[in-house]
Amino acid sequence: MAESEEEVDVLVQRVVKDITNAFKRNPNIDEIGLIPCPEARYNRSPIVLVENKLGVESWCVKFLLPYVHNKLLLYRQRKQWLDREALVDITSTLLLLNPDFTTAWNVRKELLQCGVLNPEKDLYLGKLALSKHPKSPETWIHRRWVLQRLQKECSPSGQELKDSAESRRQCERLQRALQEEMRVCAEAAGRYPSNYNAWSHRIWVLQNMAKGNLKVLHDELSSTRLWVSMHVSDHSGFHYRQHLLKALAKELSPAAEKDVHTSQQPNGENTATASDDNHHKDVMPRLFHEEIQLCTDLIESYPGHETLWCHRRHVFYLWHQWRREHMQGAGSQSPALTHTDVLLSKELCDNNSISQAMDIDCVLDGSKHGSYTQDTKRLKRGPLLLQPGFPSEHTFISRILTGCRNPEQSRFAIAYRKWLDSVIGQ
């Protein structure tokens, strides 16, 4: 259909207003999308709002996108003046349709800096843009800028430090932002396979908003277990778990624990106790065992997926490095045998009975009953974990090759064995 320039302007202005009104009517919109519709069949708005879903009929995009794009460029070139409210509406519409338009994000940065927008509102727009374009690099880059600004806003000043209520509110604000960011990353990863941008952003969030937070690291390792089990070819998801294991190993290292002991919380309490040391020695062997067991289950259930073998290789290498550093850390001090040492040496023992293993466990740790944590107790209820080792990995490979009918699975198993012999076996 042929429209005059004036008619197009009126149409587009109405559509922009309809989008703005849709967000006012329902501030809980959580997804946007295009509705395939080659031409306008009815005399009605092309903006469709159903529950928390916002749809835009595709016929209007060819008019809408060039209009808002040109409007914003004219503003940046100082050829046309737009008030702040109009800028918010135009940039919102433009970024929902094309989130990789850097100029629009830069305009919103200026609006944030002058106080027209708040960080949470801008993060919400980015979340909606990612529901349609989950890999948009400009959106992820902008989110990091906004999160850094949010952190600065929540950093307590001298006066706020005296106001415990205000300090607590800012802390809760950051905590909500952290939880929301993890949800956004998970949703984007589910919408686009091997979404490197989403997983990289998730790592950035951990490094900048949850640095040294063991609870967040443990929760992330637990929450992504099911996800990777359902996406066995997603390299980025498994790489994220590798990052979590490395971060946990670093935070639970003796050097890190020493730093933790000397640090204090704002309330003056130490962040770690002596009982934590005993517990931390057992955490990493258990986590490595669980990760290797996860790899075993997935490799046997989904043969022929190279991602799983690559992940197993990386996890075993991390375990090998951690074990070597742990042994070197003991040095010549000849420390007393601990539960961890039993776990490390279990692979060298014959197949003793479960009751015998549990008796050894009780003897070794009988003097530490008062310092058990809940995780330690859970670990003690079963037999000692068989930790991954060079012999156990060769046994696993032999079992795979013996019963394997998938040529790709055999090729990956043989390659893994060569890697073990050439890298670990040296």
Swiss-Prot record:
Family per similarity comment: Belongs to the protein prenyltransferase subunit alpha family.
Swiss-Prot/TrEMBL PFTA repeat ranges: 86-119, 121-154, 180-213, 219-252, 290-323
Lineage of the species this protein comes from: Eukaryota, Metazoa, Chordata, Craniata, Vertebrata
Pfam families membership: PPTA
Ranges for region Disordered: 255-279
Domain of life where this protein originates: Eukaryota
Gene source species: Danio rerio (Zebrafish)
Protein name in UniProt: Protein prenyltransferase alpha subunit repeat-containing protein 1
A single GO cellular-component term on record: cytoplasm
